[in-house]
Amino acid sequence: MTQLKYLLLVSRQGKIRLKKWYTAMSAGEKAKIVKDLTPTILARKPKMCNIIEYNDHKVVYKRYASLYFIVGMTPDVDNELLTLEIIHRFVETMDTYFGNVCELDIIFNFSKVYDILNEMIMCDGSIAESSRKEVLHHVTVMDTMESNDNLERVLS
């Protein structure tokens, strides 16, 4: 069973575009992780291994276009290749939802990105749903409910 500690989306310029923490940490610990990992991963060459060790856990990352998807995982429990597959499935799901997702989609629609992520990964960092079709169905239902709620507010 996969147990994620955190997921970060970082641009090539080193700006955090999205972060989700699945393990309780102090603000200082979170800031240190971001501060340490961002330049380390950005400096790595494309042909280098996508798995690095950091303190007490492993970090798996993958670059898609101008974004780095960085995942911290528990070393004893997790499978690094499964974590890479989770990253890929997350990107595929966003790509289907947004239609060729880009960094601006994530910036301007971050709440939808969090919805997709929350449908895929539970709050403790374990996988909730791996089917892209199911995740998209749930997010679409949420969109419909949200638009109906907004319509009711306008009409009342």
UniProtKB/Swiss-Prot annotation:
Key words of the record: Cytoplasm, Cytoplasmic vesicle, Endosome, Golgi apparatus, Membrane, Nucleus, Protein transport, Transport
Assigned GO CC terms: AP-1 adaptor complex; cytosol; endosome; intracellular membrane-bounded organelle; nucleus
CDD domains xref list: AP1_sigma
Superkingdom in the source lineage: Eukaryota
Protein family according to the UniProt entry: Belongs to the adaptor complexes small subunit family.
Organism: Saccharomyces cerevisiae (strain ATCC 204508 / S288c)
Additional note from the record: Present with 6370 molecules/cell in log phase SD medium.
Stored PANTHER family: ADAPTOR COMPLEXES SMALL SUBUNIT FAMILY
Full protein name: AP-1 complex subunit sigma-1
One of the GO biological process terms: vesicle targeting, trans-Golgi to endosome
Stored Gene3D superfamilies: 3.30.450.60
